[in-house]
Amino acid sequence: MSVISMKQLLEAGVHFGHQTRRWNPKMAKYIFTERNGIYIIDLQKTVKKVEEAYKFTKEVAETGKPILFVGTKKQAQDAIKDEAERCGMYFVNERWLGGMLTNHKTIKTRINKLRELEKMEEEGVFNVLPKKEVIKLRAEKEKLEKYLGGIKDMPELPGAMFVVDPRKENIAIQEAHRLGIPVVGIVDTNCDPEQLDFAIPGNDDAIRAVKLITGAMATAVIEGRQGAEEEVAEDQE
């Protein structure tokens, strides 16, 4: 039983690539044909690659390490946030701030600032401060929440990263590689699959296609975490 069926992939439009003039020759092996000036992705290969990525993601989740979901393009933002939250993982869906992985110290300082502002608001400090100052602090808090909210509770560097569109998330991928963090992701016909450790050929511009594949990776995390919990329970018996 495959993780995602051919029917699901077709219905979500995963097979539609980019225009033939916008392509990366390294994607040739994943292209089935060309239709009306658009490349059609070979979904049999997509099914296989989804399964490989699923198995790997599940194994990482079994170790208890966090997995970071990254997708800042409009078509990916909701799926990245929703699916990361569904599997209890972390995400970046607004903008990748340079150094999010490689300059952990600076990012940690900003996260601490966000926590401090949250605490001030919870404890009613905002109610006694001058209105002008509160407006400024709220704006700062909202900005920090927007960019760092999805990673503020991440306990350590991720064991793996999932990305939508490596062209868009190039800096994130470079940082992951520098730290030896494996990267899984969706690659359209204009991408370089060699940038990723586990490349899933597919349409990275259709919301349904992105949601389907991101959802499969989130399910892999849930399955991996459950497996790890069951092992712990058995050990304790």
Curated annotation (Swiss-Prot):
Q: Does the keyword Ribosomal protein apply?
A: yes
Superkingdom of the source species:
Bacteria
Segments forming a coiled coil: none
UniProt keyword annotations, A-Z: Ribonucleoprotein, Ribosomal protein
Q: Which Pfam families match?
A: Ribosomal_S2 (PF00318)
Q: Which GO terms describe its cellular component?
A: cytosolic small ribosomal subunit
| Example GO molecular function | structural constituent of ribosome
Q: Which GO terms describe its biological process?
A: translation
Q: Which NCBIfam families match?
A: rpsB_bact
Q: Which family does it belong to?
A: Belongs to the universal ribosomal protein uS2 family.
Protein name (database record): Small ribosomal subunit protein uS2
